[in-house]
Amino acid sequence: MAQAQDFEVLRYDVTASLQPVANAVDVKATLSLVNQTTQGQSATDLILRLNKDAKVTALLLNGATTEFTQKEDPRLTGVSIVSAQLVKSVPPAGKLEAVLQYTLTVKESNQYSAITPGDCLLLPESYWIPVVHTPFTSHGADTAPYTLTVTLAGDGDILSEGERKGDGKTVMFTQTLNSQPWLMVGAPGKLVTRSITPAGATPITLTTISQVGSAGTEGQVQRILDEMEKIVGFYVQTLGPSPTNQFVVASNFREVTYISPGTILVGNAVFRRDRVEAETIEYLSRAVARTWIGGKLRVRGRGLGIVQDALPSFLSGLYFESRFGADAGQQFWARRVRSYAPLALARTDAMLMAQVPLDSDYFTSILNKGALVFRLIDWQFGKNTVVTAVKTILTGTTMDPLTVEGLRSTLIGPDKNANQPLQRFLKQWWDEIVEPDLIIGLPKKNETGTAWTCVLRNLGTGDVTVPVVAITGKGETLTTKAAIPSKGLGSVEFQTAEEVVRVEIDPDKLYPQTKFELDPNSSQFDNDSRPPRQYSFSLFLEANQLFEQKEFQKAEAKLLQTVAQEPGYASAQMLLARVELALGKSEATQSALQKALDVKPTPLYVTGWSAIVEGELALTRKDFKAAVEAYRRADGANAELACTLAAHKGLIESETQLQQISMPDESVKAYFSQLEKAVQSKTASVIEALVIKAELPKFVKGLALTKPDVWKTEVIRASQLDTQHVAVDVNLEALTTDLITGEKKDQKGSAVFILRKTQSGWVLARIDLFTVK
């Protein structure tokens, strides 16, 4: 793993002075390094990577000022290479202290970095801290313990991870687990704590930090704490003692998600919802697992995604089965199959060992196929095979860092023979590209009439051992296993004299196949079942397309077929409720809606659209108060764009009917008057004074170029997001000039403007739901 000379980061010590008005941060980063070479060579130079917009002013090596060069990395966009020759070489296992002083300016905010008044974000992916290795190499990210001292010139609460000391403008964080420095500044959050003591464990503090300012979030805070208590308890029981005595779930205005040991970032929407839905539970349970895997033990080496990401995803599935039962566990794995299916069908996926986060399909493959492979290990080689191996590693003292090869060795055990079954399985699924495509033939009764035989075939690659089921005319289910070689044949026999009416290979979709159903474009029969049937996910996608085309009766037929095959498919039940509503079938709407909500945990799609359907039903009853409550829940869910648009439309309609529409205060109305005048002044500096340019550079540039002759905003309603932000629904009318043709364009539509309150007044921070055309 180590090269001829290869520094490892042992520790970070960072001081950061944030200057939000200047969109800048002054940093002093101290890296404690060790030459970890395994080839006996001394290190003669140091190469670090840093954000290209960071201007390095000094480099000290072991306390001595050292000359350096800084140039853009030709391979990584937005990254620079800082390099220096060492005055004195560093022998193998020798240590080096490197201190960099620099100023980083973030001119345009993005998902990894932002420095603006009242809202800052610096994540490791932005390279705001110098590193030796990028996450895209076989080494992996340079995770290590750290201290981070942050000084803030301006308003906002400072957050990072680990033990916190200090309040107000200067705060220090000490993280003893393996991580990388990051920070966030946002609106003052409401902090709620709970002390738990999992069975046989030491006390652990759970904390939520919510920036959400709206009333009624107390229940959701408690639901999040309840879920975290169960998740942490599950992992203490499954993996051993917790590496940390605290877990924090913190929300943020940017809706950014980020996982670090003991601290989990979620969007503000998570705290606005009326339940902790399935996707958030998946995310939280995966995040907590990474406190053990990656936090306690560093993850390094080729194929690290298998351990760092696929393994926590698999463990999340075990939590679902433990927490909600077998049906919920099956739906968890069904979501993995559905998410991976398009990539499998495209046949463009790489072997798991070769994948790195830079790959466009990395997370689709690793979080889904990678987790399914771990599930296959448990199914084929015995329940808890994976957990037993992981717990052995975590409770031992011989494996740090944790590598794929270390996990492989522990799984296989003392028998390292290449033909050992688990050894061959891992080689096939981790080290090779495997694309199975399983089909089953018609069942045939034997001559004695006491059994039925089915021929099986693998049209794709990879040896498989797969379950096969038969359904008799009396409804009896018979199950057996069959081994099918790569591109080969197999068979199964069902011992029954009863008529077999249906057979299916791999009914639970254990294997990530390239196809699951009849391919109309293929002359080769290609289906997992006889009689042939369409996979429920494909039926759902077709029904959704028909719904968007307003072919409601055809969509209804598809969805009735879908839920008959898979009653626990909550999203299909939810779409069916929407279709029945469009058809005016109120009883059928209520029935499908209830079936969707009965599936626990509730998917986000159901969380959002169920509230829309409830709002629509309330409007038909002219129960405008109930409609307002439902649409507010739909808006808070932040499920998907169409759902949020429908929520805003419904809120405006129902609040208007109640004559209780939420209007902003006079200062917000005055802001829009100022913005209209600024835009029509056609002066960039005047516009920039009312907009956070780093957040909306394209908006500011667009106004400066098109120079609208008309810009009118009609304020419709407003809602307080947190102590710093307000969302304002507006109707917008503009007369702009086409930059190519010079023609005048009259544009109208609606938008949601997000305003931020700063020391100088309201400024535009974000534009959501922009439908101006």
Language model regions located:
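Amphipathic alpha-helical substructures
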Residues: 40, 243, 363-454
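Acidic/His/Gly-enriched intrinsically disordered linker/tail segments
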Residues: 303-372, 376, 380-381, 398, ...
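Exposed beta-sheet edge and beta->alpha loop/turn motif
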Residues: 471-473, 624, 723-773
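Extended, low-hydrophobicity, Ser/Thr/Pro/Gly-biased non-transmembrane segments
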Residues: 87-88, 97-194
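Short solvent-exposed beta->alpha transition segments
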Residues: 405-409, 422-426, 655-729
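Juxtacatalytic substrate-recognition/specificity segment
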Residues: 148, 192-305, 315, 319, ...
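A surface-exposed beta-strand-loop module
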Residues: 54-118, 486-499
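Beta-strand-rich binding/interaction modules
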Residues: 57-60, 418-423, 435-439, 443-507
